[in-house]
């Protein structure tokens, strides 16, 4: 009975690692055909923001210029002019199809992430007892570590999150999350988030050291500052 109780939190921990991926994959597959059919049938215009409109317009202008340049090096004839118009028409249809797929992708991924968040939130609430056990195990493990190991771990974590080379990692992570939700890539938004998050984390971390760590383990703070210097 005791072994069963000990394995239950471990099983719960494993489920936390693999369950989000499985739920995301399953929900995505279940919603894909429904969202595609709903969008193509309703021909809705939602989720087409200014960034998407600008992107589509830029692609169309670029396409028109390339086709026009291609015709400039040829002899002007009625046949060529007709082919030029047909080429623009075909490529325009292709651009519209791509944009339509992007809209479906946005709705699908956004809906999938919302549903997954709701399911995982409910799963976490139902497994509150297992989370409490895992938390006690983690606290006991950290308590048994030496101050030197703790200081090294804190220093490594802070360097990864708010160190000199961290902006590139933040850019990749935020870009991945941005893409996962189906949003159109925007360098300005991602750059703003990358320049903001590390500063906020750095402020929170310094407050945590000043407020709690100094009181709980002054020796750990001394070792940390020595290693950091």
UniProtKB/Swiss-Prot annotation:
It is a multi-pass membrane protein. Belongs to the CemA family. The chain crosses the membrane at residues 7-27, 107-127, 189-209. Coiled coil: none annotated. HAMAP family: CemA_PxcA (MF_01308). This is Potassium/proton antiporter CemA. GO terms for biological process: potassium ion transport. One of its GO terms (molecular function) is proton transmembrane transporter activity. The lineage of its organism: Eukaryota, Viridiplantae, Streptophyta, Embryophyta, Tracheophyta. InterPro entries: CemA. One of its GO terms (cellular component) is chloroplast inner membrane. Keywords: Antiport, Chloroplast, Hydrogen ion transport, Ion transport, Membrane, Plastid, Plastid inner membrane, Potassium, Potassium transport, Transmembrane, Transmembrane helix, Transport. It catalyses: K(+)(in) + H(+)(out) = K(+)(out) + H(+)(in). It is found in: Plastid, Chloroplast inner membrane. It comes from the Eukaryota. Contributes to K(+)/H(+) antiport activity by supporting proton efflux to control proton extrusion and homeostasis in chloroplasts in a light-dependent manner to modulate photosynthesis. Prevents excessive induction of non-photochemical quenching (NPQ) under continuous-light conditions. Indirectly promotes efficient inorganic carbon uptake into chloroplasts.
């Amino acid at each position: 009975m005791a072994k069963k109780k000990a394995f239950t939190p471990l099983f719960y921990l494993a489920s936390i690692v693999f369950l989000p991926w499985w739920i995301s994959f399953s929900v995505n597959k279940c919603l894909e055909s429904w969202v595609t059919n709903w969008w193509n049938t309703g021909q809705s215009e939602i989720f087409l923001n200014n960034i998407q409109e600008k992107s589509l317009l830029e692609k169309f202008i670029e396409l028109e210029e390339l086709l026009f340049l291609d015709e400039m090096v040829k002899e002007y004839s009625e046949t060529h002019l007709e082919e030029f118009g047909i080429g623009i028409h075909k490529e325009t249809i292709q651009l519209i199809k791509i944009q339509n797929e992007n809209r479906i992708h946005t709705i699908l991924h956004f809906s999938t992430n919302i549903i997954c968040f709701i399911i995982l939130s409910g799963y976490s609430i139902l497994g509150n007892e297992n989370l409490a056990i895992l938390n006690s195990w983690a606290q006991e493990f950290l308590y048994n570590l030496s101050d030197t190991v703790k200081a090294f771990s804190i220093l490594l974590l802070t360097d990864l999150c708010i160190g000199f080379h961290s902006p590139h990692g933040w850019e990749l992570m935020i870009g991945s999350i941005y893409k996962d939700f189906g949003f159109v890539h925007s360098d300005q938004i991602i750059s703003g988030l990358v320049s903001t998050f590390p500063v906020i984390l750095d402020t929170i971390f310094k407050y945590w050291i000043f407020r709690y760590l100094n009181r709980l383990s002054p020796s750990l703070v001394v070792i940390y500052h020595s290693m950091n210097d």
